[in-house]
Amino acid sequence: MSLVVQEQGSFQHILRLLNTNVDGNIKIVYALTTIKGVGRRYSNLVCKKADVDLHKRAGELTQEELERIVQIMQNPTHYKIPAWFLNRQNDITDGKDYHTLANNVESKLRDDLERLKKIRAHRGIRHFWGLRVRGQHTKTTGRRRA
Protein backbone atom coordinates (compact mmCIF):
# COMPACT_ATOMS: atom_id res chain seq x y z
CA MET A 1 0.00 0.00 0.00
CA SER A 2 1.48 3.30 -1.05
CA LEU A 3 1.46 6.42 1.02
CA VAL A 4 -0.58 9.22 -0.54
CA VAL A 5 0.22 12.70 0.68
CA GLN A 6 -2.52 15.31 0.30
CA GLU A 7 -1.84 18.98 -0.24
CA GLN A 8 -1.93 20.95 2.99
CA GLY A 9 -4.72 23.36 2.03
CA SER A 10 -7.01 20.85 0.31
CA PHE A 11 -8.60 19.22 3.39
CA GLN A 12 -11.67 20.93 4.86
CA HIS A 13 -12.60 20.05 8.44
CA ILE A 14 -16.10 21.53 8.18
CA LEU A 15 -18.11 21.71 4.95
CA ARG A 16 -21.19 23.84 4.39
CA LEU A 17 -23.77 21.92 2.33
CA LEU A 18 -27.45 22.90 2.05
CA ASN A 19 -27.32 25.24 5.09
CA THR A 20 -25.84 22.47 7.24
CA ASN A 21 -22.38 22.08 8.74
CA VAL A 22 -20.96 18.72 7.68
CA ASP A 23 -17.99 17.16 9.47
CA GLY A 24 -15.10 16.67 7.04
CA ASN A 25 -13.35 13.98 9.10
CA ILE A 26 -15.92 11.21 8.53
CA LYS A 27 -16.59 9.27 5.33
CA ILE A 28 -18.79 11.05 2.80
CA VAL A 29 -21.66 8.52 2.96
CA TYR A 30 -22.10 9.06 6.70
CA ALA A 31 -21.22 12.76 6.60
CA LEU A 32 -24.15 13.50 4.28
CA THR A 33 -26.57 11.97 6.80
CA THR A 34 -26.13 15.02 9.04
CA ILE A 35 -28.28 16.91 6.51
CA LYS A 36 -31.94 16.66 7.46
CA GLY A 37 -33.85 14.51 4.98
CA VAL A 38 -30.79 12.44 3.95
CA GLY A 39 -30.42 8.93 5.32
CA ARG A 40 -27.74 6.31 4.75
CA ARG A 41 -29.46 4.72 1.75
CA TYR A 42 -30.14 8.03 0.00
CA SER A 43 -26.61 9.23 0.75
CA ASN A 44 -25.12 6.02 -0.65
CA LEU A 45 -27.21 6.28 -3.82
CA VAL A 46 -26.32 9.94 -4.37
CA CYS A 47 -22.60 9.24 -3.97
CA LYS A 48 -22.80 6.39 -6.49
CA LYS A 49 -24.70 8.57 -8.99
CA ALA A 50 -22.10 11.33 -8.56
CA ASP A 51 -19.21 8.87 -9.15
CA VAL A 52 -17.59 9.73 -5.83
CA ASP A 53 -15.34 7.27 -4.00
CA LEU A 54 -17.38 6.01 -1.04
CA HIS A 55 -14.28 5.54 1.11
CA LYS A 56 -13.13 9.16 0.87
CA ARG A 57 -13.50 11.51 3.79
CA ALA A 58 -15.88 14.41 3.25
CA GLY A 59 -13.09 16.95 3.63
CA GLU A 60 -11.04 15.36 0.84
CA LEU A 61 -13.64 15.97 -1.88
CA THR A 62 -13.08 18.62 -4.50
CA GLN A 63 -15.45 21.53 -4.99
CA GLU A 64 -16.66 20.01 -8.27
CA GLU A 65 -17.58 16.71 -6.57
CA LEU A 66 -19.45 18.54 -3.82
CA GLU A 67 -21.42 20.58 -6.36
CA ARG A 68 -22.30 17.38 -8.22
CA ILE A 69 -23.54 15.76 -5.00
CA VAL A 70 -25.67 18.78 -4.07
CA GLN A 71 -27.10 18.97 -7.60
CA ILE A 72 -28.14 15.31 -7.49
CA MET A 73 -29.65 15.68 -4.02
CA GLN A 74 -31.71 18.70 -5.09
CA ASN A 75 -32.92 17.19 -8.41
CA PRO A 76 -33.06 13.41 -7.90
CA THR A 77 -35.61 12.70 -10.65
CA HIS A 78 -33.28 14.17 -13.31
CA TYR A 79 -30.68 11.55 -12.35
CA LYS A 80 -33.04 8.54 -12.62
CA ILE A 81 -33.58 8.08 -8.90
CA PRO A 82 -36.95 6.29 -8.64
CA ALA A 83 -39.98 8.01 -7.10
CA TRP A 84 -40.31 5.39 -4.35
CA PHE A 85 -36.92 6.50 -3.02
CA LEU A 86 -38.07 10.08 -2.40
CA ASN A 87 -39.48 11.32 0.89
CA ARG A 88 -42.36 13.36 -0.52
CA GLN A 89 -44.26 11.39 -3.15
CA ASN A 90 -47.41 12.70 -4.84
CA ASP A 91 -47.34 16.06 -3.07
CA ILE A 92 -50.76 17.32 -1.98
CA THR A 93 -50.38 20.70 -3.71
CA ASP A 94 -49.28 19.70 -7.21
CA GLY A 95 -49.07 15.90 -7.29
CA LYS A 96 -45.34 15.75 -8.12
CA ASP A 97 -42.60 13.74 -6.42
CA TYR A 98 -40.00 15.65 -4.39
CA HIS A 99 -37.18 14.98 -2.00
CA THR A 100 -37.21 17.68 0.67
CA LEU A 101 -33.91 18.54 2.34
CA ALA A 102 -32.57 20.61 5.25
CA ASN A 103 -34.91 23.38 6.46
CA ASN A 104 -37.60 22.43 3.97
CA VAL A 105 -38.35 19.16 5.83
CA GLU A 106 -39.51 20.94 8.98
CA SER A 107 -41.60 23.52 7.13
CA LYS A 108 -43.34 20.88 4.98
CA LEU A 109 -44.15 18.79 8.08
CA ARG A 110 -45.53 21.85 9.86
CA ASP A 111 -47.63 22.72 6.80
CA ASP A 112 -49.01 19.17 6.62
CA LEU A 113 -50.00 19.20 10.30
CA GLU A 114 -51.63 22.62 9.96
CA ARG A 115 -53.59 21.39 6.94
CA LEU A 116 -54.79 18.33 8.88
CA LYS A 117 -55.86 20.51 11.81
CA LYS A 118 -57.59 22.98 9.51
CA ILE A 119 -59.73 20.37 7.76
CA ARG A 120 -60.47 18.76 11.15
CA ALA A 121 -59.17 15.35 10.10
CA HIS A 122 -58.87 12.69 12.79
CA ARG A 123 -55.07 12.81 12.67
CA GLY A 124 -55.10 16.60 12.91
CA ILE A 125 -57.38 16.57 15.94
CA ARG A 126 -55.20 13.96 17.70
CA HIS A 127 -52.13 16.12 17.01
CA PHE A 128 -53.96 19.15 18.39
CA TRP A 129 -54.92 17.28 21.57
CA GLY A 130 -51.37 15.93 21.99
CA LEU A 131 -52.50 12.29 21.85
CA ARG A 132 -51.11 9.31 19.97
CA VAL A 133 -51.98 9.47 16.29
CA ARG A 134 -51.20 6.05 14.82
CA GLY A 135 -53.72 3.86 16.62
CA GLN A 136 -51.70 2.97 19.70
CA HIS A 137 -53.49 2.02 22.91
CA THR A 138 -53.70 4.90 25.37
CA LYS A 139 -55.56 3.39 28.33
CA THR A 140 -52.47 2.85 30.45
CA THR A 141 -49.55 4.39 28.56
CA GLY A 142 -48.68 7.90 27.48
CA ARG A 143 -50.17 9.59 30.54
CA ARG A 144 -47.30 11.91 31.26
CA ARG A 145 -47.89 15.33 29.76
CA ALA A 146 -45.52 18.21 29.37
Swiss-Prot record:
Cytoplasm listed as a keyword: yes
Annotated function: Component of the ribosome, a large ribonucleoprotein complex responsible for the synthesis of proteins in the cell. The small ribosomal subunit (SSU) binds messenger RNAs (mRNAs) and translates the encoded message by selecting cognate aminoacyl-transfer RNA (tRNA) molecules. The large subunit (LSU) contains the ribosomal catalytic site termed the peptidyl transferase center (PTC), which catalyzes the formation of peptide bonds, thereby polymerizing the amino acids delivered by tRNAs into a polypeptide chain.
Crosslinked residue numbers (Glycyl lysine isopeptide (Lys-Gly) (interchain with G-Cter in ubiquitin)): 36, 49, 80, 96
One GO BP: endonucleolytic cleavage in ITS1 to separate SSU-rRNA from 5.8S rRNA and LSU-rRNA from tricistronic rRNA transcript (SSU-rRNA, 5.8S rRNA, LSU-rRNA)
Modified residues (N6-methyllysine): 48
Family: Belongs to the universal ribosomal protein uS13 family.
Note: Present with 48100 molecules/cell in log phase SD medium. There are 2 genes for uS13 in yeast.
UniProt PTM: N-terminally acetylated by acetyltransferase NatA.
Post-translational modification N-acetylserine, affected residues: 2
GO cellular component: cytoplasm; cytosol; cytosolic small ribosomal subunit; mitochondrion; small ribosomal subunit
Sorted UniProt keywords: Acetylation, Cytoplasm, Isopeptide bond, Methylation, Ribonucleoprotein, Ribosomal protein, RNA-binding, rRNA-binding, Ubl conjugation
Subunit-level organization: Component of the small ribosomal subunit (SSU). Mature yeast ribosomes consist of a small (40S) and a large (60S) subunit. The 40S small subunit contains 1 molecule of ribosomal RNA (18S rRNA) and 33 different proteins (encoded by 57 genes). The large 60S subunit contains 3 rRNA molecules (25S, 5.8S and 5S rRNA) and 46 different proteins (encoded by 81 genes).
MF term (GO), any: rRNA binding
Subcellular location: Cytoplasm
Species per Swiss-Prot/TrEMBL record: Saccharomyces cerevisiae (strain ATCC 204508 / S288c)
Alphabetical list of InterPro entries matching this protein: Rbsml_uS13_C, Ribosomal_uS13, Ribosomal_uS13-like_H2TH, Ribosomal_uS13_CS
Pfam families noted in UniProt: Ribosomal_S13
Designated name of the protein: Small ribosomal subunit protein uS13A
PROSITE patterns in alphabetical order: RIBOSOMAL_S13_1, RIBOSOMAL_S13_2
